[in-house]
Design a protein with these regions (language model features):
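Cyclophilin-like peptidyl-prolyl cis-trans isomerases
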Residues: 2-3, 16-181
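Sec-dependent N-terminal signal peptides
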Residues: 7-16
Length: 181
């Protein structure tokens, strides 16, 4: 009887351990290109996840390499929510009233919404105005965990250093330059 109980307990323990290794345990995806954002407040480093959002990462890296984000200003900052940038009009201080209304006009075309990535503090995702497949250049960084956004936006990266800088960003702060490390 004891031998059966021990074997059953050992078997149950193994099943639970194996289950915990994959199902329900979020694991960090393989990292892709690292993006550095030099702002007027300091430097932010982002690790991207092309395994979860390949087209989104490809589009983002292409825009970074084309210097698209350089000299843009953050147009949206909501305390305990997000900071947001990516409107080319934000390079022009005279257009401040219109910042945030457009992107580069070239939608990614797919909604790469990963079940592995969640909106924890420092998550990086693509902003959109109703259809995730129409996201183009505007991206955001979460200032706090926002589970209510999960499944609605394409997450493609995570801040790995400079979260203290992210927390200091205000509307109008400048991206001096962004580059692939």
């Amino acid at each position: 009887m004891r031998r059966t109980s021990r074997a059953a307990m050992l078997g149950l323990a193994m099943v639970l351990w194996i289950g915990a290794q994959g199902v329900g345990i979020a694991q960090t995806p393989a990292p892709g290109p690292v993006i550095v954002i030099e702002t007027s407040k300091g430097t932010i480093t982002i690790e991207t996840y092309p395994s979860e959002a390949p087209k989104t990462v490809e589009n983002f890296v292409k825009l970074v390499k084309a210097n698209f984000y350089n000299r843009q200003h953050f147009h949206r900052v909501e305390k305990n929510f997000v900071i947001q940038v990516g409107d080319p009009d934000s390079k022009d201080l005279a257009k401040k009233d219109t910042w945030g209304r457009r992107g580069n006009g070239q939608p990614i075309g797919v909604a790469e919404i990963s079940k592995k990535l969640t909106h924890k503090k420092g998550a990086v995702g693509m902003a959109h105005s109703g259809d995730p497949a129409k996201a183009d250049s505007q991206f955001y960084i979460t200032l706090a965990a926002k589970k209510n956004l999960d499944g609605k936006y394409a997450l493609f990266g995570q801040v790995t250093s400079g979260m203290d800088v992210v927390d200091k960003i205000e509307v109008g702060d400048l991206i001096r330059r962004m580059y692939v490390k």
